């Protein structure tokens, strides 16, 4: 049973949260939420020395994108993705991410990584290279899926980059918390129920992360998504929205109208899986018109609402164990939710790895607040308000005295945000026993809510005006600066050896997949889709 009201002695949602926080503050219990597992997945466009999208293949010296666990590609062959192993601290996570960037820059042959979420100068849509994963069946599936995304939404939209934060509380939390809550479900069902509650609450509060960390208020005029004509000219080469926090998270970016009718309920794991399963098995007439195989070429994996579950955009995803051999839907059914993936973070342009410690600390504390707060089901009316809030904050989050829709009324953004941050502060104090900066991260959030000029989005616009640069010139300068920074660092001997070995091993594994006996692709695909 999902937790929807107080079950811990409090007589209100706020009372229940306070009761759980007091329990965590008891001697020895704070360790239950410290040192959970976390990881980062960071995308960056690969560009040439002049800032144009690279048309070179993914560098072989980085390994095989299909099989490398840490260095792969996202949508485009020119969109590398840096994936850290799970770590027990944010410092370890960012150090690993930095090491991956050092290793990559040593092998990029003079190319750069674009530092912003909004793209560099792109070629015609059909010339943006789709990621290539070889001729094995798993590789073909990944490439054809991306080809389908291009037909459905356009390739340029898939060139928008971001940071994903993966998080799971310590394993030791679940049995103790289940006992404290006097819950009778199995351990697996309890964990899944609580993490689905976290997902619902994060959906409710995702706007706050967009406000605090959105860093894409402007874009290069060469990038013309639907709706760009509503933006204002900042300079001859730059479009912007004066109060925007994240055009990436707006209806100009990922949250476009193509999935506007699709709602995947997170009110329980069963509802989530059933809704996703329906979307990946229900034909969409618009996509039927594209065709699946046309003149012998695969255009998409199928003509369903979603080709596979990864196509569904959401601010946060419940995720199964990575060790499962099933596709995500099957794994969620069999093993439940193990961790969550936060997907609302823009690239922080001025940080060489795209994200910093303070951001990770705040998001971690926010996730704990979402986990331990009561989490009633989200009904259709509330979902409409959530969607409206998210878009409003993305497009106008820094507008003075902005009010957000909630409970069929409206609340001032700053006031509401400060109330949430006050609740998050209790969890930051729990996490900050060793002076790791969680409390300081919460204080930075307070300052940004009191003064919108202290947000990253405001800083980007301020830099553009102060330096009198177009967005393209500004981002290209940062890309060059970041390259010099990484080339000035040295990997430890062990890490250099490990990453070099992984590159070689991934190439061998990918080549072995291509040599191994395999069924025809159509048969392979039928087997893959049977695992729903």
Regions found by a protein language model. Name each.
Residues 134-155, 159, 167-331, 352, ...:
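Loop-rich catalytic cores of soluble enzymes, especially ATP-dependent carboxylate-amine ligases
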Residues 438-532:
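Extended, compositionally biased alpha-helical segments that mediate assembly or anchoring
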Residues 333-334, 340-428:
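Substrate-recognition/cap regions that form aromatic- and gly/pro-loop-enriched pockets
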Residues 2-150, 157-163, 190-200, 204-207, ...:
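Terminal catalytic/cofactor-binding subdomain
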Residues 39, 95, 99, 136, ...:
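Generic recognition of stable, solvent-exposed alpha-helical segments in well-folded globular domains
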Residues 123, 406-468:
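Long, compositionally biased intrinsically disordered regions
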């Amino acid at each position: 049973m999902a937790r929807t009201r107080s079950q811990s002695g409090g007589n209100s949602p706020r009372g229940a949260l306070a009761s759980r926080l007091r329990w965590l503050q008891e001697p020895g219990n704070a360790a239950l939420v410290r040192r959970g597992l976390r990881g980062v997945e960071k995308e960056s466009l690969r560009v040439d020395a002049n800032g144009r999208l690279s048309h070179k293949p993914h560098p072989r010296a980085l390994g095989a994108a299909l099989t490398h666990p840490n260095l792969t590609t996202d949508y485009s062959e020119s969109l590398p993705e840096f994936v850290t192993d799970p770590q027990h601290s944010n410092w370890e996570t960012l150090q690993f991410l930095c090491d991956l960037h050092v290793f990559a820059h040593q092998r990029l042959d003079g190319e750069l990584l674009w530092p912003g979420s909004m793209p560099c100068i792109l070629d015609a849509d059909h010339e943006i290279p789709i990621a290539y994963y070889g001729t094995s069946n798993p590789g073909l599936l990944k490439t054809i899926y991306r080809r389908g995304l291009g037909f459905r939404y356009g390739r340029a939209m898939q060139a928008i980059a971001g940071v994903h934060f993966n998080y799971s509380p310590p394993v030791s939390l679940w049995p103790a918390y289940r006992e404290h809550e006097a819950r009778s479900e199995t351990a697996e069902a309890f964990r899944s129920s609580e993490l689905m509650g976290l997902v619902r609450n994060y959906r409710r509060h995702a706007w706050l992360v967009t406000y605090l960390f959105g860093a894409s208020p402007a874009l290069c005029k060469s990038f013309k998504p639907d709706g760009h004509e509503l933006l204002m000219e900042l300079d001859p080469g730059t479009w912007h929205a004066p109060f925007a926090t994240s055009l990436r998270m707006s209806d100009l970016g990922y949250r476009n109208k193509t999935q506007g009718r699709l709602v995947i309920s997170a009110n329980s794991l069963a509802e989530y899986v059933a809704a996703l399963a329906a979307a990946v098995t229900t034909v969409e007439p618009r996509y039927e018109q594209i065709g699946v195989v046309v003149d012998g070429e695969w255009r998409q994996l199928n003509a369903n609402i979603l080709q596979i579950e990864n196509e569904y955009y959401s601010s946060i995803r419940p995720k199964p164990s990575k060790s499962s051999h099933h596709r995500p839907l099957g794994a969620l059914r069999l093993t439940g939710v193990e961790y969550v993936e936060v997907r609302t973070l823009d690239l922080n342009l001025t940080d060489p790895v795209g994200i910093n410690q303070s951001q990770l600390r705040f998001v971690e504390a926010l996730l704990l607040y979402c986990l331990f707060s009561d989490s009633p089901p989200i009904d259709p009316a509330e979902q409409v308000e959530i969607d409206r809030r998210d878009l409003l904050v993305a497009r106008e989050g820094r507008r003075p005295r902005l009010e957000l829709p909630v409970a069929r009324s409206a609340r001032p953004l700053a006031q509401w945000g400060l109330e949430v941050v006050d609740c998050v502060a209790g969890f930051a104090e729990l996490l900050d026993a060793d002076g790791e900066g969680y409390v300081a991260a919460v204080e930075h959030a307070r300052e940004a809510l009191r003064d919108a000029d202290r947000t990253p989005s405001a800083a980007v616009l301020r830099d553009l005006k102060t330096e009198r640069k177009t967005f393209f010139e500004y981002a290209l300068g940062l890309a060059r600066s970041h390259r010099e920074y990484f080339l000035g660092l040295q990997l430890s001997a062990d890490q250099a050896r490990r990453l070099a070995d992984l590159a070689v091993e991934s190439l061998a594994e990918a080549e072995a997949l291509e040599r191994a006996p395999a069924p025809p692709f159509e048969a392979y695909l039928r087997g893959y889709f049977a695992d729903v």
